[in-house]
Amino acid sequence: MAPTSTFPVINMELLAGEERPAAMEQLDDACENWGFFEILNHGISTELMDEVEKMTKDHYKRVREQRFLEFASKTLKEGCDDVNKAEKLDWESTFFVRHLPESNIADIPDLDDDYRRLMKRFAAELETLAERLLDLLCENLGLEKGYLTKAFRGPAGAPTFGTKVSSYPPCPRPDLVKGLRAHTDAGGIILLFQDDSVGGLQLLKDGEWVDVPPMRHSIVVNLGDQLEVITNGRYKSVMHRVVAQTDGNRMSIASFYNPGSDAVISPAPALVKEEEAVVAYPKFVFEDYMKLYVRHKFEAKEPRFEAFKSMETETSNRIAIA
């Protein structure tokens, strides 16, 4: 396994001082060459993060642990009987909260009111941070401020924003199942608050799996497929996975700031060179991309892009014939 010492960690405090150019260069390099980075001093209070961690772990213990143990027993039995089936299972307990365009947190069962209020506060902080990061990316890309958030909002004027809350309990057979199988994320920019004592998250870089180091009060950021398309491939989404662990229960709170379902996604014209004879990335509606993604999530992203390029070509040919 590749060493983790060079994994990009960015101190956002440096963006306010004389070291801003170096920090922006580090951010640009992380987006170009890693698709992942970790940020410190990001503006979300450590007290809020500690409270979120405590209540999330308490919620799992109180509500979800027994359900997961029942699932785990069945999963291991099926996996032992059928290895091919085990390869398609994920060793995780999850629930999903939608924040935008409309929140569903009031409808999720088994959440106490204090936890609901806390998650709404945390989501508001993460939304602000996501938009701040997108503007920093615009600056590095030479795009006007707000270009990416505007592209994400679509005709309806709102992005899609939600949080996946996951627990990865100890697994007695990590040789049999993954915590979460390898995939790229379909959307825009993903902000992860992960456990600082139990690892397992890995990304694929230069053909090797690299550990994403757990760091207290950090936020891990990764780029989704939509940013790869909009940046015309300058920034990349990256395959990542969670490896099941024999010890410890890993907490993961991943918030996805994605385009609105009606947003039309295509490379930013400013990032497409005039001499490009072949269009590298397609144009599509985000909702259509998601329909394809859910069927092929755990596969390479390139065939998804090619499928939409083929659709574009067919449409253009029909128009030309008409």
UniProtKB/Swiss-Prot annotation:
Pathway assignment: Alkene biosynthesis; ethylene biosynthesis via S-adenosyl-L-methionine; ethylene from S-adenosyl-L-methionine: step 2/2
Enzyme Commission number, as recorded: 1.14.17.4
Class in the EC hierarchy, top level: oxidoreductase
InterPro entries in the record: DIOX_N, IPNS-like_FE2OG_OXY, IPNS-like_sf, Oxoglu/Fe-dep_dioxygenase_dom, Plant_2OG-oxidoreductases
Residues that hold Fe cation according to the record: H183, D185, H240
GO biological process, one term: fruit ripening
Pfam families from the UniProt entry: 2OG-FeII_Oxy, DIOX_N
UniProt name for this protein: 1-aminocyclopropane-1-carboxylate oxidase 1
Gene behind the chain: ACO1
